[in-house]
Amino acid sequence: MQELEKRLEKKLQEYVSIIAEEYHEYIPESKKRFLKSITSFEKCISISDTGTISLFYRNNKIYLPKLAFLVLEQLKEHEQYGFDPNHKCYNEETIISNSNTFLDYINHAILKGLTPEEYYQENLLHEAMHFCGCGGANPLLEGITELKTRELAKKKGLITSGCGYPKEVEVVLRLQKIFGEKLINTIVFSDRTLSETVEAISGNEIASLYRTINVKMSESSYQYLTAKFDGKDAHIKKAQLYNKIDYSSVHELLDQYELNQMLSGKINLENEKGDVKWYHK
């Protein structure tokens, strides 16, 4: 176990370095000083009995579930286990936006014959993004973190699952398209609240929209985000509960916002090479 932790610590150190370089203009100085002060990542990762199958970040430490050993061991009983050792849940075209859920990830784990170390590695980049930025804690921030994880994985050829928070990523992609990448990048690394960050950059009206979206998403996913997925069937519980999340009210809100902005002349809709493109004046 210690050797495994050492390999993961080394990988985390690599990811932190990449993230710090890629997003240096968005990372607050206090966080930059903290990251530079780390002389060893030994205390930054722990494989523990966390009572859940999920990885999570808390107080400058990433917790990896020991439960993964039990869950992945029982998948070996499946007749298709290890059938495709090179299996991936995405390709270059679908890594950013896809409809994968944890059910797809379970299927991936079976086909690939996923080991606990591979499970940790495929989800470590997302946690490294938390380590360098915000702590998550709500579905909107998790979606923003996952989108940045996927974008970085695609750009740098890094390992990721491509299955984390797909419904949240769908919402964030719309927000990024409407309000721009700079705002989303700032949010993921901000040391202020979501509302304060958005208001400072885009004003109170848009901050109010973000607050409403955040509340709606939190209400829709409360049961999932507060659940502990434990036991040998933890992966099934997690997949089933996630499938119940419905953000249709959030998408309706964004539909109405885009329509209002277009009608008021604040957003133009033009056809460029056959593609519809939204942009702010």
Residue ranges: model-predicted function:
Residues 2-118:
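Auxiliary, metal-adjacent structural segments of Zn-dependent hydrolase domains
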Residues 4-21, 149, 246, 254-258, ...:
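Hydrophobic face of amphipathic alpha-helices
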Residues 23, 27, 31, 153-156, ...:
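A broad structural signal for alpha-helix termini and local helix breaks/kinks
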Residues 136-179:
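Post-HExxH zinc-binding segment in Zn-dependent metallohydrolases
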Residues 166-281:
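Pan-zinc metallopeptidase signature
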